[in-house]
Design a protein with these regions (language model features):
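A structural "hinge/loop" feature
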Residues: 18-23, 88-101, 216, 225-230, ...
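Gly/Pro-rich hinge or "lid" segments in bacterial periplasmic/extracellular proteins
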Residues: 64-67, 76-77, 83-159, 170, ...
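Ligand/substrate-recognition segments at binding pockets and active sites
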Residues: 174, 269, 306-414, 448, ...
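Detector for C-terminal structural segments
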Residues: 250-298, 352, 356-366, 396-563
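Extracellular/periplasmic solute-recognition and catalytic clefts
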Residues: 131-145, 161-230, 258, 262-268, ...
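Alpha-helical secondary-structure segments
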Residues: 22, 27-30, 78-80, 156-157, ...
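Short, well-ordered beta-strand elements
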Residues: 2-7, 30-33, 79-80, 126-128, ...
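Surface-exposed binding/hinge segments that line
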Residues: 3-10, 23-106
């Protein structure tokens, strides 16, 4: 259907940062929240702009009447959304911040001060109240004693300490001293062996989460502030190379991800962070099979080099020097016919404070150059200040400002559907298209040269299908195309890291999409002693069994919902 109606809890209240009751949470607050996001041109509007009736027209100024938008307060406890098209995954969007409520009276009283970096600039209706926010230092939350479900909030105080990665021993040191309840460990840090000796039974690896990272190429680079290239001929040669599929595949097969993972994880955990698809392989299932299994079955259509490939997490199915050399030989022949000069220089920038990533990128450089030969390909690593790195990559406002040939970016799902990942490369609206040097919606011959127009057609066909199994099958086709293109070369996920913790295993919420997963501290419990590996594995086994049953039930309910 196109109409979704939600009933709100009468017990839900707004509170100030001091814990004073301000007002009840009403359906009108959800209308106000979406209107505020639209008026302020929120960067997260892409999630709902084309989903909610009338919202796109309001955002683009075709109407100034927000009452034409498909979000209504039917009464104080009933909010209703009307969609432009069926979205079987709509319910999973509702946990995203773009649809969060906002009290109109409070918003008016704060004016331009609303939402500033000050706990008193917003209201709270959840389990915690923010008490302090000191940039690059600490964020502190206190339990909201008046929260409607306070009985399920087991921690009174939450402090999040800023960590820039420059002192890798700091997290473990603070855990050992009792300041932290959770600490990520860095096996290549100077103190790790000592920590490991004292905690050999207590180091546990976190679950891999739904955030996927992948290398991509800048297909239409315009900025060369940070480069090792010394001539226009070198720039042109690199541009020709990255547009060549055999060249991209050669890089893919020459990249030793296990060696890359070892730089932050150590040898014991080197593979525990590895991810091999943009869409996590277990994100959805299709007739009892994981999404990754179905994608693997489709790779036979793309050549013998993909035969028998396994896309499961925590192993590297790509690294293969023989395949890499064969693909490069094909690429070199094709590129030399176009007058390309070798070696191809690929600029890769990295934040100079991120020691683990510097080690990882140097490992990638070593594996690619040793397999393909430094007389053929050179990875030029540029260590930049945090400001320069951010401004030429993550924070760059346009594709033309992206100053690199290779970029390692990531994406996590906004909602429970493969499109949440795969649409990011849509040539009309892709969320990471700028990282490829392309502007969404603008004609670019480079996008067509690598087949992104064909890929976008596959996405559009998949999005027409509402039956979950058939829909996911079509998205598996699109993911298979993306693998073969090597435009996005998956490497790691978040999670999968060695930790010390006093958090009771699997007491925290879990979600593959939205904002109700590990970022929520409701239900979280602490224990006095450090969690042991044995405790963690037993809890994990029980949790996985319960999760499998829960997922099966949810999939059955979804199938009924869309019919």
């Amino acid at each position: 259907g196109l109409t979704y109606t939600y009933k709100l809890r009468k017990e839900a209240k707004w509170y100030t940062s001091e814990g004073e009751e301000y007002a009840p949470v009403t359906a009108k607050d959800f209308v106000t929240g979406l209107q505020y996001a639209a008026d302020k041109k929120s960067e997260a509007l892409y999630l709902v702009q084309e989903s909610v009736v009338g919202l796109d027209d309001y955002i683009n100024g075709k109407t100034k009447d927000f009452s034409t938008v498909g979000v209504k307060a039917i009464d104080d406890q009933t909010v209703q959304y009307t969609l432009t098209r069926p979205e079987p995954y709509w319910n999973s969007k509702t946990t995203s911040t773009i649809l969060f409520p906002l009290n109109a009276d409070f918003l008016k009283s704060k004016g331009d001060d609303f939402g500033k970096v000050d706990p008193s600039s917003i209201l709270y209706n959840g389990p915690f109240l923010m008490k302090s926010f000191v940039s690059k230092s600490v964020i502190e939350f206190k339990k909201n004693p008046n929260y409607w479900d306070a009985k399920n909030v087991f921690v009174d105080d939450v402090k999040l300490a800023y960590f820039d990665g420059s002192d890798q021993d700091a997290l473990a040191r603070n855990f050992v001293e009792g300041a932290y309840s959770y600490a990520r460990l860095y096996p290549n840090s100077s103190s790790f062996e000592g920590i490991k000796e004292k905690n050999k039974d207590n180091i546990v690896y976190s679950l891999q989460d739904a955030t996927s990272y992948f290398l991509n190429f800048n297909l239409d680079r315009k900025s060369y502030k940070f480069t090792a290239k010394t001539s226009d001929a070198e720039k042109k040669s690199t541009q020709e190379a990255v547009l060549n599929k055999n060249f991209r595949q050669a890089i893919n097969f020459a990249y030793d991800r296990t060696a890359y993972g070892a730089q932050s994880q150590g040898e014991d955990g080197a593979t525990k962070i590895l991810r091999n698809l943009v869409v996590p392989p277990n994100f959805v299932s299709i007739n009892g099979k994981d999404f990754g299994e179905v994608v693997a079955s489709k790779m036979v259509n793309y050549g013998k080099e993909w035969q028998g490939i396994n896309f499961a997490d925590a192993q590297d199915p790509y690294y293969n020097p023989e395949k890499a050399k064969a693909k490069f030989a094909e690429a070199k022949k094709e590129l030399q016919a176009k007058g390309v000069q070798f070696p191809i220089h690929l600029d890769k920038t990295v934040d100079l404070t991120n020691k683990a990533e510097i080690q990882g990128i140097n490992s990638m450089k070593q594996s690619i150059e040793s397999v393909l030969g430094a007389d053929n390909v050179v990875i030029d690593v540029h260590q930049l200040s945090t400001e320069d790195f951010d401004n030429t990559s993550y924070l760059a406002q346009t594709a033309a400002q992206k100053d690199y040939d290779l970029y390692n970016g990531g994406w996590s799902a906004d909602y429970q559907d493969p499109s949440s990942y795969l649409d990011i490369f849509n040539i009309n609206s892709g969320g990471v298209l700028q990282n490829l040097g392309l502007e969404p919606g603008e004609a670019n011959d480079k996008a067509k040269a690598v087949g992104l127009d064909v890929y976008t057609q596959m996405l559009e066909e998949a999005n027409k299908e509402q039956d979950p199994a058939k829909r996911y099958e079509k998205y598996a086709d699109a993911q298979a195309w993306l693998v073969d293109s090597s435009l996005a070369i998956p490497n790691v996920s978040l999670g999968g890291t060695p930790t010390l913790r006093k958090i009771v295993p699997f007491s925290t919420p879990y979600s593959l999409a939205g904002n109700k997963g590990v970022e929520s501290y409701k239900y979280l419990k602490l224990q006095d002693k450090t969690v042991t590996k044995d405790e963690y594995e037993k809890a994990k086994e029980k949790w996985l069994k319960e999760k499998e049953e829960s997922n099966k039930k949810a999939q059955e309910e979804l199938a009924k919902h869309v019919k």
